């Protein structure tokens, strides 16, 4: 009885070690041809974000459109939208400065097109607009904070 338990334990350990291997995630298709870039890129200012509108290339291998920018701290942000739509929402602008935004078309083999560079600037971020209306009042055992979130954004 004790030897059966040992054999079952050893078999379980053998299965656990045999199952541990590195899986490499890579695209199913593999070509080296990049898609054509997106065209006619325009944007609309929104509170703390911009909404890009573009014309998709007529590549049947197209998978998504990506846009990336680097903030003032040097952190790079990338946003993606499916090829089923021609708009892309880029969020996270903490101020109203001008940023350089690169827009790419990406195919099923993860080949990026040549970048389309545009200069964008967003409206006042929702957090900053809410901070300007912040009121602090004394209350029993503490304070009461109130503010107006006119853009109804997630703060």
Regions found by a protein language model. Give the residues of each.
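Short beta-strand segments within Ig-like beta-sandwich modules, predominantly Fibronectin type-III
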Residues: 77-84
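A charged, solvent-exposed segment within the mature domains of Sec-exported extracytoplasmic proteins
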Residues: 120-155
């Amino acid at each position: 009885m004790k030897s059966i338990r040992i054999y079952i334990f050893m078999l379980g350990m053998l299965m656990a070690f045999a199952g541990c291997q590195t899986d490499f995630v890579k695209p199913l298709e593999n070509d080296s041809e990049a898609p054509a870039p997106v065209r006619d890129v325009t944007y609309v200012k929104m509170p703390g974000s911009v909404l890009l509108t573009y014309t998709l290339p007529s590549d049947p291998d197209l998978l998504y459109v990506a846009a990336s920018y680097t903030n003032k701290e040097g952190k790079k942000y990338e946003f993606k939208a499916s090829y089923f739509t021609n708009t892309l929402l880029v969020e996270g602008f903490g101020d109203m400065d001008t940023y350089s935004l690169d827009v790419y078309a990406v195919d099923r083999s993860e080949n990026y097109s040549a970048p389309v560079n545009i200069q964008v600037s967003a409206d006042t971020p929702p957090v900053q607009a809410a901070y300007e209306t912040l009121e602090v009042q004394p209350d029993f055992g503490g304070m009461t904070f109130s503010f107006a979130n006119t853009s109804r954004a997630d703060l």
